[in-house]
A protein has these predicted regions:
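Structural signal for interior beta-strand "rungs" in well-ordered beta-sheet cores
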Residues: 94-197
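Catalytic-core segments of class I nucleotidyltransferases/pyrophosphorylases
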Residues: 1-90
Length: 197
C-alpha cells in the first residue's frame, strides 16, 4: 500500500528505491474523479488526492529492467544498455557474440567497417568503405552510403545517409535523408522526413 508519493523527487527528497513506472489499473469510480477537458496529471494531481482522501493505492513490485526514456540522452543510454546486454530484447538478428547484431536480410559492403556494439536491421544496407558502429542502431530499411561514418547514432526505419556523410551521437527519425557530405553531431534529434544538406 502506498503511504507517500513524490513524482520525480530531488535527491534530498528520495525516501525509497522504488519508482512509479506509469502502468496503472483503476476502478471505474477512480476514473470518474478525473475532471473532463482540463489537464490532470495522475502523479501530481490524482495520486495526492487519493492519499489525502484516505483512498488506498496498491502496488506491485516488478523486477527487471526499466528506464525512463523521457529525453534523447536517456533514450540513447537505454539503446546502449540493450546493445551491452544489460536488458533483454527480442531480435531475429544473428549475433557474432561480441555485440554485433545483424538481421539476415541486411546487406553489408565487403569493405564496410562494422564495430561493436551495434544493430543492423532487416533490409538495411551499408555500402563499401562506410563505417558503422560504436553504439549505433540502424533499423529496417536504413541505407548508409559509401565513405559515410556513423557512430553512436540511432537511425529509425528508412533513413538514408548519402555518400560521405558524418553522423555522431544523433537520433534520426523515420525517412530522414542526409545528403552527400552532410554532418550531424552530438545530441541532435532530427524529425521524420527531414532532408539535411
Amino acid at each position: 500500500i502506498v503511504t507517500r508519493f513524490i513524482e520525480k523527487p530531488a535527491p534530498s527528497e528520495v525516501f525509497s528505491d522504488l519508482a512509479n513506472t506509469g502502468i496503472y489499473i483503476f476502478e471505474p469510480e477512480i476514473l470518474s474523479m478525473i475532471p473532463d477537458y482540463m489537464p490532470y496529471d495522475f502523479s501530481n494531481d490524482l495520486f495526492p488526492r487519493l492519499l489525502n482522501e484516505g483512498i488506498r493505492i496498491f502496488t506491485t513490485e516488478a523486477s527487471g529492467y526499466w528506464s525512463d526514456i523521457g529525453d534523447i540522452e536517456q533514450y540513447a543510454a537505454t539503446q546502449a544498455d540493450m546493445l551491452d546486454g544489460k536488458c533483454a530484447f527480442e531480435t531475429t538478428a544473428k549475433s557474432d557474440g561480441q555485440g554485433i547484431f545483424i538481421e539476415e536480410s541486411a546487406r553489408i559492403g565487403k569493405r564496410a567497417v562494422i564495430t561493436a556494439p551495434c544493430y543492423i536491421g532487416a533490409n538495411a544496407e551499408i555500402a563499401d568503405n562506410a563505417y558503422f558502429g560504436g553504439y549505433s542502431v540502424a533499423c529496417s530499411g536504413v541505407r548508409i552510403g559509401k565513405n559515410s561514418s556513423v557512430k553512436r547514432c540511432i537511425l529509425l526505419p528508412e533513413v538514408r545517409v548519402r555518400e560521405g556523410a558524418e553522423l555522431r551521437g544523433a537520433v534520426l527519425c523515420e525517412r530522414v535523408q542526409v545528403e552527400d557530405g552532410a554532418s550531424i553531431f552530438e545530441k541532435a534529434a532530427i524529425g521524420a522526413e527531414s532532408v539535411l544538406e
